[in-house]
Amino acid sequence: MEWETVIGLEVHVQLATKTKIFSGASTAFGAEPNTQACAIDLAMPGTLPSPNAKAFEYAIMFGLAVNAEIGKRSVFERKNYFYPDSPKGYQTTQLEQPIVGAGYIDIELDDGSTKRIRIHHAHLEEDAGKSLHEDFHDMTGIDLNRAGTPLIEVVTEPDISNKAEAVAFARKLHAIVTSLGIGDGDMSQGSMRFDVNISVRLKGQELGTRTETKNLNSFRFMERCIDQEVQRQIEVLEDGGKITQETRLYNGDTHTARPMRSKEEANDYRYFPCPDLLPVEITDEYIQSLRDKLPELPDARKARFIEQYGLSDYDAGLLGSDANTAHYFEVCAKACDDAKLSANWVAGELAARLNNEELAIQNSPVNAEQLAGLIARIKDQTISNKIAKQVFEAMWQGEGDADTVIEAKGLKQVSDSGALEKMVDDVMAANQQQVDAYRAAEPDKRKKMLGFFVGQIMKASKGQANPQQLNQILLSKLDS
């Protein structure tokens, strides 16, 4: 049987306002629990919410960036439910008239083609508090600092067909949000969270029953979740069972998901207009003023990187997709005056290390100026590319800048011709049989045999021999 996967995403994006969506309480991350929740956030008697104009500005900027219709009349509703981290007993959100209407994001697929993922809408709402389990024995603590933090929830159409497309969309959305400056996108702090709606069906059939897995806070978790849930649903259906429409919770420690509750529909929440908030009217002039100040977006930045720095389509897309990565690259490239080497290091060694340690580039132990200093030492042949990786590792561990590490560890490249000639003579004398075989070999076979001598000399020099000079001297002596 040939199964098809159908995926829709709901993405919660915390907006980078200084205060909450309906109160003046701070949104700063990391404060002591329950020190940033005011009477309005807790819906204490006698309090009234006051909408945060900056949240509307950021939501509209997002809508413009994703080619969406902007709601000229925006209305808030109450979504009624009881949960410990929601002190009001309801969430103030939008249902009938959201701030952002239908739009789309184009994603690039692995084969180089482009696919359009439609956005159904994006609405403003307040975040809930946070349940804390790990710090308590047989109890759950509640931290309400996050309650009332402004969110936009971005809801896609079910246009996504596999995990690669889901992650491509999520990355592109993340890039747009950070490029606009409307959110920091820090998933480790919950600034962007994904709910994944998944169903499977036999090819050509109607949509199957979907499940929703909530609160995924990394691209890696999203991939694993989709893999597991698709496989689970297929196994259930092939065994003759039925899929239960339910909400599931993913555990990032065990990489497993479990049922959380049966999936609710809108009627279950008894939405009704919020009596404390008037409808908000958005004028064409205001929308245009925000359109005029939109910053450079990922697709435009990619095109500029290709033209300005001569980067490949792949490198430009990789480095231009994220505002923080783009800034890091440009600072590095200008400091060392070498865009290509900067691109190679930022997209290669640095990106791999950040990915392994799940760090954002703005939190890298090696900043852009320091990486530029390392690249400068490669360019002036103080060190080789191989040694540069050792230097980078030491810099990552906080042992100083490139010059400090090179000096302290004695890693300067050996470029003295006399010293290199002696190394070559010693290796040739110790391996006369290989020298004779090289000289007797056909020219097309000598290149492979040359690697043996290079390897021996590099071993003797602890990788510090200048490769270009070494090759010249070695070839000269072997061919003589």
From Swiss-Prot:
EC category name: ligase
The biological processes this protein is annotated with in GO are:
glutaminyl-tRNAGln biosynthesis via transamidation; translation
One Pfam family, short name: GatB_N
What does the record give under GO molecular function? Answer: asparaginyl-tRNA synthase (glutamine-hydrolyzing) activity; ATP binding; glutaminyl-tRNA synthase (glutamine-hydrolyzing) activity
Q: What is its EC number?
A: 6.3.5.-
Q: Which SUPFAM superfamilies match?
A: GatB/YqeY motif, Glutamine synthetase/guanido kinase
* Reaction(s) the record says it catalyses: L-glutamyl-tRNA(Gln) + L-glutamine + ATP + H2O = L-glutaminyl-tRNA(Gln) + L-glutamate + ADP + phosphate + H(+); L-aspartyl-tRNA(Asn) + L-glutamine + ATP + H2O = L-asparaginyl-tRNA(Asn) + L-glutamate + ADP + phosphate + 2 H(+)
**Which Gene3D superfamilies does the entry link to?**
1.10.10.410, GatB domain, N-terminal subdomain
Source superkingdom: Bacteria
User: What keywords tag this UniProt record?
Assistant: ATP-binding, Ligase, Nucleotide-binding, Protein biosynthesis
Q: How does it assemble?
A: Heterotrimer of A, B and C subunits.
Report the NCBIfam families cross-referenced here: gatB, PRK05477.1-2, PRK05477.1-4, PRK05477.1-5
What protein family does this chain belong to? Answer: Belongs to the GatB/GatE family. GatB subfamily.
- List, alphabetically, the HAMAP family matched: GatB (MF_00121)
Q: What does this protein do?
A: Allows the formation of correctly charged Asn-tRNA(Asn) or Gln-tRNA(Gln) through the transamidation of misacylated Asp-tRNA(Asn) or Glu-tRNA(Gln) in organisms which lack either or both of asparaginyl-tRNA or glutaminyl-tRNA synthetases. The reaction takes place in the presence of glutamine and ATP through an activated phospho-Asp-tRNA(Asn) or phospho-Glu-tRNA(Gln).
Q: What is the official name of this protein in its record?
A: Aspartyl/glutamyl-tRNA(Asn/Gln) amidotransferase subunit B
Gene that this sequence comes from: gatB
